[in-house]
Regions:
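Extracytoplasmic small-molecule ligand-binding "clamshell" domains
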Residues: 27-102, 111
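Ligand-binding clefts/hinges and TM-proximal coupling segments of bilobed small-molecule sensing domains
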Residues: 27-28, 156-170, 212, 241-259
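Hydrophobic/proline-rich hinge and linker segments of small-molecule sensing/allosteric domains
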Residues: 42-43, 115-137, 224-228
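Periplasmic-binding protein-like
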Residues: 121-125, 195, 199-242, 258-259
């Protein structure tokens, strides 16, 4: 085969591959409709975004947002449990259509997966025991060997603690929802968390305080997490989030779960 024919064959093959890939991904929304459910990955341990109530029912800002996303697709929600440690791998493996449970938008996640447009501005802060607020006025006050910092594994809290508090004593606890109570009981000194979670636990537990909640160490937004390659579905989720912002739904959810 001469060079011109080889080049032509290569172009044709590439076109067929691209066309095939496009048709596969274009069918993803159709698959959700045919299945009748939107599979939503959730850790179920992050107040006020996605958590379980006393009866084991999922609640929270992102939980309700997931229901509204499913409603827009005329299907029901099917929650699929995941953990912060396995979140990225489970997303890439296609165990659910998207994850929606208070997931911070990060460059690392965007490089390997797909993240939606951002919503809700927040930042990293701390929870400590009430009465000890005066001990923690800056990162320098936290970054000491005698300060026991507790975080859950695999998420941005652990990453923040390891990168910004290298001299503190780091304690890893598997269940994020248990950490605030452990702080209140004196099992650790501080919890690294986000501003909205800190505010929620301070309201729930009179033994806790969040002295730096109005001066967070970082500024971020949440996003829905999906596997790479499904541009049609990503476009739809981004359109949905924009509409929720425009029609006031985001403000209403914030009033209900965060303020």
């Amino acid at each position: 085969m001469d060079m011109k024919k080889m080049a032509g064959a290569a172009v044709l093959a590439a076109g067929l591959l691209l066309g095939g890939a496009g048709s596969v991904w274009a069918a993803h929304l159709e698959d959700i409709a045919a299945r009748g459910t939107l599979r939503v990955g959730t850790t179920g341990d992050y107040r006020p975004m996605s958590y379980k109530d006393a009866d084991g029912k999922y609640e929270g800002f992102d939980t309700e947002l997931a229901v509204k996303l499913a409603d827009s697709l005329h299907v029901k929600v099917e929650y699929v449990p995941t953990t912060w440690k396995t979140l990225s791998a489970d997303t890439a493996a296609g165990k659910f259509d998207l994850a929606l449970c208070g997931i911070t938008r990060t460059f690392d996640r965007e490089r390997t997966l797909a993240m939606s447009d951002g919503y809700l501005l927040f930042g990293k802060t701390i929870l400590c025991r009430k009465g000890e607020e005066g001990k923690y006025k800056s990162l320098a006050d936290l970054d000491r060997p005698e300060v026991k910092v507790m975080v859950n594994p695999g998420g941005t809290n652990e990453k923040f603690a390891k990168s910004r508090l290298p001299h503190a004593t780091l304690l890893i606890h598997e269940k994020n929802a248990e950490i605030p109570s452990l702080i209140a009981e004196g099992k650790a000194d501080i919890m690294i968390t986000e501003t909205m979670e800190a505010r929620r636990y301070v309201r729930m537990n009179e033994k806790l305080a969040a002295p730096l909640v109005d001066k967070p160490f970082t500024r971020s937004r949440f996003g829905a997490l999906m596997a790479k390659g499904d541009q049609d579905f990503l476009n739809y989720v981004n359109f949905f989030l924009a509409e929720m912002e425009t029609d006031g739904t985001m403000d209403a959810l914030e009033d209900t779960y965060i303020k």
